[in-house]
Amino acid sequence: MRDLKTYLSAAPVLSTIWFGALAGLLIEINRFFPDALTFPFFSF
């Protein structure tokens, strides 16, 4: 039961950090490449 409480308390924290970092990354990409359909660093 203690492990379940640890999981339930850690998963929301980790997912919040992950989604916050992902949102920040997307915001920064859109700041440098606004309205881009293709990104220069993805083209080969």
From Swiss-Prot:
It is found in: Plastid, Chloroplast thylakoid membrane. InterPro entries: PSI_PsaJ (IPR002615), PSI_PsaJ_sf (IPR036062). One of its GO terms (biological process) is photosynthesis. Its main location: plastid. The keyword Thylakoid applies. GO terms for cellular component: chloroplast thylakoid membrane; photosystem I. This is Photosystem I reaction center subunit IX. May help in the organization of the PsaE and PsaF subunits. The keyword Plastid applies. It is a single-pass membrane protein. The chain crosses the membrane at residues 7-27. Pfam families: PSI_PsaJ (PF01701). Belongs to the PsaJ family. Keywords: Chloroplast, Membrane, Photosynthesis, Photosystem I, Plastid, Thylakoid, Transmembrane, Transmembrane helix. It comes from the Eukaryota. It comes from Pelargonium hortorum (Common geranium). The gene is psaJ.
